[in-house]
């Protein structure tokens, strides 16, 4: 790996050390992305009110739905650019880079228009209590104005990730996070703008992150170079696989968010304290998922490059090495979050009741995250092969059906917070089993392809 270019040779040599170098900055990037929400929640919880904090928390599933979808689309760009690099076709990779940027801008603007139109009805669907509705709707409407910047950042980060550069997006987000924290405090403590001011600071911070990556790629030479004259030039040959792979991946992420909307509505029926506790716990627990997601994306990128190079055995090794490293990282994060949970939660609220309710969620969600390791790794590995729609459909059917049935039957019968939280590990387990079966079937299909028949026979 070259320090200057920050590229990683995914086609040769050992895998585990390169995956760690690839995944750790990506995990920290994910944590910093969550820090945007955490900074907003902490600022409002500490300097405004628990109601303001709960109002922002009600938007987490909605914002998560849109962001999950754009990250899924960006994954399509990651896979295609990585495959082109594996094939040593820099010209094709560059066309995909410009297509990815144009797609990000178009989707970002569309998301703003759609989001602003449904912001009010979304509050009704979630049955947001009147006491927090004003804060929730103000935050969502202002936040959505910055969505084009979120889309641009995620697509450009995916492009950089395709050649192993996960450090530049991290440092861009570090700068943006510092800006966000300072902006939040200035908006609330100096200007007294409350929820709207906090949301505006987040919009500007997202613009900083996107702008830094944009400038970086303008100055980059080679396959990933952005040319101002071709920014909105869409190559149909590149767009089709980006959408074909990215659309199902985005759908899968959105499915989780839709199911979380259903769970959020159930949480809202349990009162403001439970709402605040759930928000605080989610803000802490999501950091565990950042590591799971990072090593899953490592599987996607390493598999994609090696699949482009025609090396199926190395694709398989990349999948299992990624899963092993993922387990190690996840268990370490679980120990940290569970061991220091109360101390971390005290940053969001000084209410003993809220903290205990938050710990309840952490016990029932975080301790079962290893199931997610299996689910995410096999799903992300299949996307690296360009096999994206089937994993998305399996997730759609398993996650949504289990969670909807659980909320409408088991939770409806007992109406208890713990009963509601149990739906997370149950839905993960069902989905993980189904995805493992799908992965096995897909590998058998690959073995029959002429380009891989000799490799699998020798293995």
Segments predicted by a language model, with ranges:
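Short runs within selected transmembrane alpha-helices of multi-pass transporters and secretion channels
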Residues: 74, 143-161, 169-180, 198-213, ...
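N-terminal transmembrane alpha-helices
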Residues: 10-48, 61-76, 80, 105-112, ...
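Helix-terminus/linker motif at the lipid-water interface of multi-pass membrane proteins
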Residues: 31, 35-54, 123-130, 186-193, ...
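Hydrophobic alpha-helical transmembrane segments in multi-pass membrane proteins
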Residues: 22, 26-34, 71, 103-112, ...
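Alpha-helical transmembrane segments of multipass membrane proteins
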Residues: 38-42, 113, 121, 155-159, ...
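Transmembrane helical elements of multi-pass membrane transporters/channels
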Residues: 21-40, 142, 176, 205-209, ...
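Small-residue-rich hydrophobic transmembrane alpha-helices
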Residues: 53-113, 150-169, 277-341, 372-395
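Short alpha-helical transmembrane segments in multi-pass integral membrane proteins
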Residues: 1-23, 81-146, 188-247, 303-368, ...
